[in-house]
Amino acid sequence: MTHNKVVIIGSGPAGHTAAIYLARGELKPVMYEGMLANGIAAGGQLTTTTDVENFPGFPDGINGTTLTENFRAQSLRFGTEIITETVSKLDLSSRPFKYWLEGAEEEEPHTADSVILATGASARRLHITGEDTYWQAGISACAVCDGAVPIYRNKPLAVVGGGDSAAEEAQFLTKYGSKVYVLVRRDKLRASPIMAKRLLANPKVEVLWNTVAEEAQGDGKLLNNLRIKNTNTNEVSDLQVNGLFYAIGHIPATKLVAEQIELDEAGYIKTINGTPRTSIPGFFAAGDVQDKVFRQAITSAGSGCQAALLAMHYLEELEDTD
């Protein structure tokens, strides 16, 4: 059993930013970066992104994996201890907090005075044929992140979804694509009236009602065609597009705390006044695990900074009361 002042669970931009601040504050943070935790490699969703062009400091853009490697190197430089194991159980019912590692659930728990949960969220996927082949090679789950990438410029694109996110992403993509198709499984949008009105009024948008994606096709390197099916007639046809964007929601990685802390209706951790602070003193939630609105690398990093500063303050108060 080991005890640490502060433990970070997760290794995306939120986790590493928190680690950098805490390490520079000489609090000797320990990060559990996970081993395919939540089905994603250490580093989080950025590791599945090829070109990141909207993170400050990289005027020519940077590969997502390279960016996460830079985060990791910077965390290590200032003294963060990074452990490539997955936390499988977390007990927030008493202090110090207790946690167990995957494969060692029956052993004595490790403990920490403060915990920052930065486990992120994963995009919902359709799991259609060809999806894995063309993921980040024509298929994406973030139009804001990837829409401006050269492979999509002046090309026909498609968005899957019928809610506000789909409407917003489709309109965003009209800045770059020659045309944007919106695939809606039903005969009406779930989007709010004002968002639906804007979408339907956009001359570069065509909504394909009662339509689902069946198969992603291409040349083995980039997507160039989508097999679609009409849910009323079962007719299958081809839709020539160079980009397919999913806007069907995200799944926050809250399994560790789902029964211990309040979640919102979408499953995200509820925090206090827009900060990473939660209803449990000393436990903080940073990044996409508590952010269903922005979901950007830069906002996650900012959230990690806030969590670190709040954790520092909490630990100082804890020392004063001892």
Curated annotation (Swiss-Prot):
Keywords: Cytoplasm, Disulfide bond, FAD, Flavoprotein, NADP, Oxidoreductase, Phosphoprotein, Redox-active center
Top-rank EC class of the record's enzyme: oxidoreductase
Keyword Signal: no
A biological process term (GO) from this entry: cell redox homeostasis
GO molecular-function terms, A-Z: thioredoxin-disulfide reductase (NADPH) activity
Location in or out of the cell: Cytoplasm
GO cellular component: cytosol; mitochondrion; nucleus
This enzyme's EC code(s): 1.8.1.9
Reactions performed catalytically: [thioredoxin]-dithiol + NADP(+) = [thioredoxin]-disulfide + NADPH + H(+)
Subunit structure of this chain's protein: Homodimer.
Protein's recorded name: Thioredoxin reductase
